[in-house]
Amino acid sequence: MTRGERLRAIGRFSPNGSDDWGVSSRSQGIAGRMRAVRITERWHAGGVVGVLAGLREGVVARIAPERGEGRALLAGIVAGDRRELKAQGLSDVFSAAGLSHLVAVSGAHLAIAHALVEGLLLCAGVPCGPRRVLALGLSALFVPMCSCPASAVRAWVMLASSVAGKGAGRRGHAPSGLAIAGSLMCLSDPFCACDLGFQLSMLSVASLSLFGPYARATLNALIAPRTYREMRLTPRPLRPHMAKLGRSVRSSLAASLVCQLSTWAVVAVTFGRVSTVGPIASLAVGPLLSPLVLAGLVACLLAAVPVVGGLLLAVADGLACLVVALTRQFAALPFSSVAVVVPRWVELLPIIVALLLLALWPRPSRRVLARVSLGGLAVAIAIFVRLYVLVPASVTVLDVGQGDAILVRDGPHALLVDTGPGDAITDALARQHVLWLDAVIVTHLHDDHTGGIDDLAGLVPTGSLYVGEGVSGSLPEGLGRDADRLVGSGIGELCAGDEVRLGGFTMTCLWPREVTDGSENEDSVCLLLTYGEGGAGLRMLLTGDAESNVLDSIVSQVGDIDVLKVGHHGSRVSLDGGQAAVLRLRWQAPVRATRTDTLRPSALRRLREAAPGFCARRTMAT
């Protein structure tokens, strides 16, 4: 569908739920979602909107974003078409590097488009007054052509207020322009106040206009600019250029830090992850944005010219590929993006800090800044060591919905047995303060045990991936690609007798005893987990989805255990009374049960008879 297009369809309507997505949709005026079964009528947009929508589709077709990553990026920044960015996984790459703002059409893109139009009008000899009005009107067409993102609308309204102020003989004032833009947009569409793009755009611009000069002064106080005398090794003709380059770098870094600090809370609460390399990545990739957008716009304007259009598009494609390559390098850095769990009230912290800073406005002092920086670093190191290094030995059954994910930790070491069904695993690990994994063991290849590998890849650094013997050659194409992203090409295999050690834990593989393909429950890797000795130790049996026929083969090797992870979610065939008696469970057996495969009463009865301290944990699908 294109902007302005309408459909009449027959389908099933689902009202908003009470989860975060439902609350967000309701706040934006969305009543619910409809799954269309059949489209009966379709009306294309008419008038100016229809013309601009057709022009946009023509520009996207000319760029051909499906032809490569560079073309996909061009379509995103020139025409606001991000379909191929998402399809090719580039949206996640830019997000991990903290550069999502580069692919979202915003004020920087509009400023370049406006400068291009005004430059063309200047070359045509149009007088100053009419030139400003014409440039403003023509640049306004860029906004609907990019599907009217809130950030671009905000930027154009600010530009219009600035042009109007200059026409009236008044100097520009960014906070006033931002206030006018925000007020007009909220009055025309109150629901836009709940749009994330609008919130991030307003926060960034407000912070830059209020604290940008202060941030530059602070950086100058912390890292004093080099004088010409200190540039003795630099050739004299290059010294002015080096000084200018230093000012430019400090200015860009200050702007990036201000934007990052003002929006991190909203981003963390909304997405559950924070980029740690954003300011440095912006410093390296940001200077390429202006030539990339300019080359893309000129290439689209001259697309009809046989040779010139193709040449300019090739140049823009090359620049875009360079941007993608640099972004991938930053996204691939360890801990470039960290999963976090942040309460919603944290969104107020940047506002409180900003108000205090405006009220006090302390003069930047190098000595004070150094002391504050060292103190903050010491506190950060202490918190890091407490949360991520000095961790007691534990085994945790993670809440990931309809699937299995068991976390084993001892100090700074962590291992995950199965990854759950989808993208809940990173949030679950964040709740446990896990930044990295020594290894992941996948018991078998069912989706409710492997679905989280895609979410882990690129976000949680992982040392090794283990599967059952013979399974590494049977991985489905998509899962194999995700596994390569997670640990590279080296995937280990486990068979009966192998051991995996993690801190004080030892995990002995009891099953499989022969080559499998991992496609069946009986192919599940079964692990006997032990820690310590005697009454102070722990013995736990992890069975994946293995059922009673597999337990018959390994129960004699297990002996007494403290904890049993019941196979196949406690199904009817997961355990029989004889096996429960032989295992002699001491205190509890965590079980995951779903609506489609519930914990059977017979299994419950056997477990309660075998383990007086039995507890069952159910997770119901919605």
Regions found by a protein language model. Give the residues of each.
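Core dinuclear metal-dependent hydrolase active-site scaffold
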Residues: 71, 83, 184-194, 328-439, ...
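Membrane-interface helix/helix-cap signal primarily in integral membrane proteins
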Residues: 1-101, 427, 436, 458, ...
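Aromatic-rich juxtamembrane segments at the membrane interface
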Residues: 27-156, 163-164, 417, 539-544, ...
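Active-site HxH/HxHxD metal-binding segment of metal-dependent hydrolases
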Residues: 447-486
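Internal transmembrane alpha-helical bundles of multi-pass membrane proteins
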Residues: 148-352, 552-567, 577-587
